[in-house]
């Protein structure tokens, strides 16, 4: 069991996750975005490459409407000449706007997310997880609810070491009620594979359940970008609905 499989296999239900790091071969940044879902509305989605980004779109409009559409449909990744923005919500657009500021990833995230709170999905209050790759560097962010209801914002530099990444997810992993939200610093993980396809497939396999009737996987996307030319992209997407 490699470090990718080992970490992700322990997460029975991670919700959505972002992993960022450096490819195991070549000077390319890697961004992984994955969706898992328990409810029918969360499952009724897919990732689609369009309009200079990767968008979360419904596979069944009627089923999706049974959930909170505002939280279920959004741009997961947006590409710009200066870099890449990624998140689990509509805050992705604000992050992309900040990529052209000339600032590094942490200042870009801090400014873009200053007005964003955790998701209004009581009693869980799902965190907003975000990241960006800009100016040859990467960063991650976690916006979550504190014990007294306050908004806690954390920002992290992501070290770019060959074959290694950092991961944040919306939930800690146990599938129980209420879902325990992610806390602390991003988890260290190996980035398996030398291409976006190999990395996406490794993540998709690692998220497979022990019991087939509890397969929460929805989609996985992997993007690699040149460190010197962030608009030089390679993309691979896996949608579970297209594999069954």
Regions found by a protein language model. Give the residues of each.
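Conserved short alpha-helical segments that host acidic/polar catalytic motifs at enzyme active sites
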Residues: 1-244
């Amino acid at each position: 069991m490699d470090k990718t499989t080992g970490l992700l296999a322990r997460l029975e239900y991670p919700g959505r996750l972002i992993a960022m790091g450096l490819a195991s071969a070549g000077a390319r940044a890697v961004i992984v975005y994955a969706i898992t879902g328990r409810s029918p509305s969360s499952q009724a989605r897919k990732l689609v490459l369009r309009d200079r980004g990767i968008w979360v779109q419904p596979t069944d409009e009627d089923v999706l409407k049974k959930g909170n559409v505002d939280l279920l449909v959004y741009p997961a990744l947006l590409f710009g000449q200066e870099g890449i923005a990624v998140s689990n919500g509509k805050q992705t657009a604000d992050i992309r706007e900040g990529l052209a500021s000339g600032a590094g990833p942490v200042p870009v995230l801090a400014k873009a997310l200053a007005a964003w709170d955790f998701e209004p999905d009581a009693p869980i209050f799902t965190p907003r997880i975000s990241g960006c790759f800009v100016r040859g560097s990467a960063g991650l962010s976690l916006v979550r609810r504190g014990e007294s209801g306050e908004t806690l914002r954390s920002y992290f530099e992501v070290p770019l070491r060959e074959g290694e990444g950092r991961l944040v997810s919306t939930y800690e992993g146990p599938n129980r009620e209420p879902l325990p939200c992610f806390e602390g610093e991003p988890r260290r993980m190996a980035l398996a594979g030398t291409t976006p396809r190999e990395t996406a497939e490794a993540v998709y396999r690692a998220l497979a359940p022990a019991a087939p009737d509890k397969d929460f996987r929805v989609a996985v996307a992997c993007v690699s970008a040149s460190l010197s030319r962030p608009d030089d992209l390679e993309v691979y997407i896996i949608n579970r609905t297209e594999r069954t």
